[in-house]
């Protein structure tokens, strides 16, 4: 499926336009009634078209050292996933540092740098060896987390959506098509700095579950569709940020992602 087909297919999935957005990361609203909702989109590198976001899936504890620091045993048990709303996207253009609002209700706000896969095909029960055929391209992203709320809900045996799924909780750079990258990223440095100090420093090859395996596992629980994106997990040494901090994220082969906590 080419990029134009991707957008045409996804247009049927959501109300509102999928291209020509007024604001980066948010679609221009063509709503004629109060009940129509604008489509969230992300710029595509090398194209004037934009990637329409249907769902945001995230995998938890997909690097062994991070699993340990979160109190888990990093064995190859089936992975677990959670979701963020599509409008949690905050698009950040390469070469810029975007203002990112410190959220309400938290006193322990954490960064998590991640590789993001964007799908242009979907299905159910997708075999791992066929899963990468679903991937349109990749981006660098942040899974921002209200850690105190996440842990508090976990301690109470309650869903911790409030710690993960909130406004602006998914900063992301542009989508780089596979044709531009030349290959699916499976190794290479992934790091994050806060105010110039390295906090996270790992390699994509250290993922417990590869992107292909994540797609396969997800497709057993959900019917995946064009427009889905998958945050593929973060390395160890997650930690807090406060207002005024500047976060710089890097993945080899992709432009850095920068935000300032405001």
Predicted segments, located by residue:
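Extended, compositionally biased flexible segments
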Residues: 29-130
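A residue-level signal for conserved active-site and pocket-lining positions in enzyme catalytic cores
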Residues: 60, 117, 143, 172, ...
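Structural motif
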Residues: 55-57, 79-81, 114-116, 137-139, ...
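Hydrophobic, well-structured mid-protein blocks that either form specific transmembrane helices
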Residues: 125-162
